[in-house]
Curated annotation (Swiss-Prot):
Protein name: Photosynthetic NDH subunit of subcomplex B 4, chloroplastic
InterPro entries: PNSB4
Consequence of gene disruption: Malfunction of the NDH complex.
GO terms for biological process, alphabetical: photosynthetic electron transport in photosystem I
Function: NDH shuttles electrons from NAD(P)H:plastoquinone, via FMN and iron-sulfur (Fe-S) centers, to quinones in the photosynthetic chain and possibly in a chloroplast respiratory chain. The immediate electron acceptor for the enzyme in this species is believed to be plastoquinone. Couples the redox reaction to proton translocation, and thus conserves the redox energy in a proton gradient.
Topology relative to the membrane: Single-pass membrane protein
Keyword flag Thylakoid: yes
Protein location: Plastid, Chloroplast thylakoid membrane
Source organism of the structure: Arabidopsis thaliana (Mouse-ear cress)
């Protein structure tokens, strides 16, 4: 069995900046002596000013090196393979976009899938429909039954009082 591990390192990290480069020289038919030294100096100052403010996220020549090291059982030799990848800003953007889209797809797909726990008797044993509103509906049903029972008891007491009052009147009339 071969054991392997992989490491990623940044090698020869050189971040280019615009003030290291000289400004572009125009060599067209209209380019002549009239383009004075002051204009070139102004252009150089603008390039330096922009270099202090504007930076790209990653330079185009950022090498990412993958080192694969394998050690074979019973052997003392180590086999090393090096691969260098240069990732551009567009490639990094594509990787992140793929990750975001894959994550959104996973959330939508697995969010809409059936869940055996919520469909089980353990969860719906009390009569729930999975929405959560059944708790309030059940509570309202219990309260409605309790009110109906209370009204029934009050009505029975009121009828008994009236019947008792009528009996007293009948007894008073008969005496």
């Amino acid at each position: 069995m071969a054991e392997a591990f992989t490491s990623f390192t940044f090698t020869n990290l050189h971040i280019p900046s615009s003030y290291n480069h000289s400004p572009k020289q125009n060599s067209g038919p209209n380019h002549g002596y009239w383009l004075s030294k002051n204009v070139n100096e102004k252009r150089e100052r603008n390039l330096m000013r922009g270099s202090l403010c504007v930076r790209k996220a990653l330079p185009h020549d950022l090498p990412l090196m993958a080192v694969m090291v394998q050690q074979i059982e019973g052997m003392r030799d180590i086999i090393t393979e090096k691969h260098v990848w240069h990732l551009s800003d567009k490639a990094i953007k594509n990787v992140y976009m793929f990750y975001i889209m894959f994550t959104c797809w996973g959330c939508l797909y697995f969010g809409s899938a059936k869940d055996p726990f919520y469909d089980s008797e353990e969860y719906r044993g009390d009569g729930g429909d999975g929405t959560g509103y059944w708790v309030y509906e059940t509570q309202e049903d219990i309260e409605e039954k309790a009110r109906a029972e209370l009204w029934r008891e009050e009505l029975i007491e009121e009828i008994e009082q009236k019947v008792g009052g009528l009996r007293e009147l009948e007894e008073a009339v008969t005496k």
